[in-house]
Amino acid sequence: MTVRPFTLSRRALVLAASLAIAPLTQAADAPRVLFKTSAGDFTIEVYPDKAPKTVENFLQYVRDKHYDGTIFHRVIPTFMVQGGGFDQNYQQKPTRAAIEHEGRAALAKGGLRNVVGTVAMARTNAPNSATSQFFINVADNAFLDPVPIPDGDPVAKFEYQGRVHENVPRAQLLAAPQLYGYTVFGKVVAGMDVVQKIKAVPTGPGGPFPTDAPQTPILIQSATLVK
């Protein structure tokens, strides 16, 4: 099964225009992971106080050396770069069980949104399906953020994608897959220039992907917990 972070049309992707990268602040006690790749090195910082299950899942894959020898298999320069699931032969690596989606809970705790430089879990259309794959936002992708559900039951008024819905059962909104968004659990704090280099590589067919696969493989040589 191919794990992708979205099921959006190419037209929708174009709407996520690439923006200038602002300096990223760093948290003193947050764990950091150094990725050494064939394009250079970058470091991400992760936030267990915002998305504890997601971060622990990711760090366990790091400790298990799951990411070593995998590739960035999907690159869309106006959107994101995705990796963590396939080796150089486009064989999908075995994973542990999928984890619970923490997007809404993370935002409620002041977590990050899907903006340039942040790192989120990839998944299928099922909200609770993330395993090892992750993506780095290379544009501000607000449409990937969890949609907040207003108070009340039923919800008196709910607006989504230009349509207004009235008196909707709260449970129905909370369960709607399209409102879950994608869980952001970290951000790039060093080496964003390397991520920019990755997003600029020529892409085309590769493995199970008809488009968006780097034509020169971008290999993750190692991912190491450095803090």
Give residue ranges: language-model regions.
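N-terminal export leaders
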Residues: 8-14, 19
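Cyclophilin-like peptidyl-prolyl cis-trans isomerases
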Residues: 2-6, 24-227
